[in-house]
Design a protein with these regions (language model features):
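Extracellular, repeat-based ectodomains that mediate carbohydrate processing or recognition
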Residues: 1-179
């Protein structure tokens, strides 16, 4: 229940997939192993995005508890593994910016289906101001690189609202964000 401070009301990450043959979505299943509050806070699980890997595995990432989480399904979304924290998100996903009500640093995932590399970008206040970060996995999400500062600003500016895509022919990674 959105906005509820009742401990019985919890946020979860759910998954459903579209079937072309039946022209319908599957019944949604909960894929997050933990739950968050419903206050639209850093303790709320939200901002889920997904990507399909080289071998058909499905990856889902989301934010919550000042962390970036991932889960993976290797059977088309029927079953999911154990949630894994792949990065800490100091300050959480909801960042206060000058002249903006709130800036989000939600994670986005994309898969290079040729090289079998998964990339995740997000924004946080790791350096004291909002920056955009990238990590990647070359082993189907089992281990992740160190965080890379994409925005590389030299002033006290803020970068946020990131998103990414991959050129599946060249393998180039493109990240767009507000600055």
């Amino acid at each position: 229940k959105y906005g509820s401070d009742n401990q019985a009301d919890r946020s979860r990450i759910r998954f459903s997939k579209y079937d072309l043959k039946s022209d319908s979505f599957s019944t949604a299943i909960t894929i997050s192993d933990t739950t968050g509050d419903c206050l639209d806070s850093d303790n709320t699980l939200e901002g889920a995005t997904s990507a399909v890997g080289k071998n058909g595995e499905i990856y889902a990432v989301w934010a919550g508890y000042e962390s970036i989480w991932i889960d993976k399904s290797s059977d088309g979304g029927v079953t999911w593994g154990k949630d894994q924290i792949i990065a800490f998100q100091p300050g959480g996903w909801d960042m206060d910016m000058p002249h903006i009500m709130r800036a989000n640093g939600m994670p986005f995932i994309a898969s290079d289906t040729v090289k079998d590399i998964q990339y995740v970008t997000w924004a946080d206040e790791f350096n004291g101001n909002a920056d955009v970060w990238l990590i990647y996995s070359k082993d189907q999400g089992n281990t992740w690189s160190e965080r890379i500062n994409v925005s590389k600003d030299t002033a006290d500016g803020h970068q946020y609202f990131p998103n990414l895509t991959i050129d599946q022919k060249s393998g180039e990674v493109f990240i767009a964000f507000y600055d």
